[in-house]
């Protein structure tokens, strides 16, 4: 178990990459986040799950392993039932585009087939729910199989996994007010079904397909279900803006639809030059609704980190889109507070959040790969007095334009990691802080303090 105090984004320590966050307030009143675990730059997820929890959105506990791929008996078992994950006979517009691009790239290229025993055992996005004294963890694996494991504790460990009669990724679970449980899953194609009373089985004949679609709802993957008053909210990775970096939602009057598309809750495009997908949920904690989502880092589509933003559900049931912030569920950064470079919530250009681990110095993350014209955005800073200085811990050289609320507050020159000046000028208030880089030479940003 590991403890970490932080009320801002990203939520967890910089070396802990938990994407696909499903947030649930459990009977003990604490919020538990169930997600996958990224630990490589060339593959999504890994072979393990870790559950994180908090009682106050600031003090976090990273619990021990909840489930590992090695505990799932049917993975790579040639005799286990196989269920198709995606219907390739009826491609969506996105599928057609990808298939065409893949065909062009692979034209004349022979792909080496790996023996089954060499295939990695990865666990993709999970979900969890409590019923009658038991916590049920629904999970999916790299072979398109899906299953459920159980525990008497919300953080696990989970055991006794049972395979479900379906294939695909991104399971979600929901229990309605009458006690009936529902199961959702699918990539490109969405599916839902009533679970049996044992919470570990269902009748495949009762599966409802196409709950939300790419064509009508911009659905890509990452199903998540909630209910607010009499309205059911189907949250998912949304393709409306060309790639699934958004969390969108559709609403209905039944847990199995029909659902009407409503819009986007948050878009993580711009968190990294290679940002590609999003997956998350909404949940109410201590009277406040939040959206849980992730951001990629290190100039790749992986190393995704848990982030949180407050949201508002309007009287008419709609949810206004919110922007990514550095403050997250916490307060704006005040005078004298340290802002870490990796807390940037928006990046423009080639700059990204990179990592390094040095003997004796440990693990650290910073803004790196900075080119002329790049920008890094931090939302928000706040002061009751006039801003007059900024201190930037950095490496390399460059000229940094400091903008507050889009207006230039000053310029900072850095030479071989030594800051030459610190003066800025801006009236008191709350602002978006932007660093714009020029004449860069090996420039990297570790920390910022503004006064």
Tell where the protein language model's regions lie, with residue ranges.
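Carbohydrate-active catalytic/glycan-binding domains of CAZyme proteins
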Residues: 1-411, 416-451
């Amino acid at each position: 178990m590991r403890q970490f105090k932080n009320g801002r984004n990203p939520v967890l320590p910089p070396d802990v990459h938990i994407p696909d966050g499903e947030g649930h307030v459990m009977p003990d009143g604490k919020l538990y986040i169930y997600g996958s675990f990224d630990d490589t730059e060339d593959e999504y997820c890994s072979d393990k799950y870790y559950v994180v929890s908090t009682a106050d959105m600031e003090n976090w506990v990273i619990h021990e392993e909840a489930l590992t791929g090695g505990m799932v008996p049917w993975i790579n078992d040639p005799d286990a039932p196989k269920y198709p994950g995606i219907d390739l006979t009826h491609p969506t517009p996105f599928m057609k585009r990808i298939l065409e691009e893949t065909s062009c790239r692979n034209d004349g290229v022979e792909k080496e087939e790996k023996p089954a025993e060499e295939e990695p055992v990865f666990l993709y996005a999970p979900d969890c729910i409590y019923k009658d004294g038991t916590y049920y963890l629904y999970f999916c694996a790299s072979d398109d199989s899906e299953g459920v494991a159980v525990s008497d504790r919300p953080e696990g460990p989970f055991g006794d996994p049972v395979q479900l009669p379906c294939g695909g990724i991104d399971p979600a679970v929901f229990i309605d007010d009458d006690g009936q449980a529902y199961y959702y899953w699918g990539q490109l194609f969405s599916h839902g079904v009533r679970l049996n009373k044992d919470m570990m089985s269902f009748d495949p004949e009762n599966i409802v397909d196409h709950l939300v679609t790419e064509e009508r709802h911009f659905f890509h993957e990452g199903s998540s279900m909630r209910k607010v008053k009499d309205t059911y909210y189907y949250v998912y990775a949304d393709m409306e803006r060309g790639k699934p970096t958004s969390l969108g939602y559709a609403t209905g009057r039944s847990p199995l639809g029909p659902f009407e598309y409503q819009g986007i809750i948050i878009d993580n495009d711009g968190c990294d030059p290679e940002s590609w997908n999003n997956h998350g949920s909404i949940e109410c904690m201590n009277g406040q609704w939040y959206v849980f989502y992730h951001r990629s880092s290190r100039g790749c589509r992986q190393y995704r980190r848990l982030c949180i933003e407050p949201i508002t559900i309007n009287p008419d049931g709609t949810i206004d889109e919110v922007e990514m912030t550095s403050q997250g569920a916490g307060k704006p950064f005040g005078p004298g507070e340290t802002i870490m470079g990796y807390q940037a919530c928006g990046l423009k250009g080639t700059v990204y959040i990179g990592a390094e681990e040095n003997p004796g110095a440990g693990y650290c993350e910073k803004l790196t790969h900075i080119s002329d014209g790049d920008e890094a955005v931090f939302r928000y800073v706040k002061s009751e007095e006039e801003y007059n200085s900024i201190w930037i811990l950095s490496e390399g050289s460059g000229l940094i334009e400091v903008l507050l609320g889009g207006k230039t507050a000053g310029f900072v020159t850095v030479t071989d990691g030594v800051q030459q000046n610190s003066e800025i000028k801006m009236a008191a208030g709350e602002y978006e802080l932007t660093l714009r880089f020029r004449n860069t030479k090996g420039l990297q940003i570790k920390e910022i303090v503004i006064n």
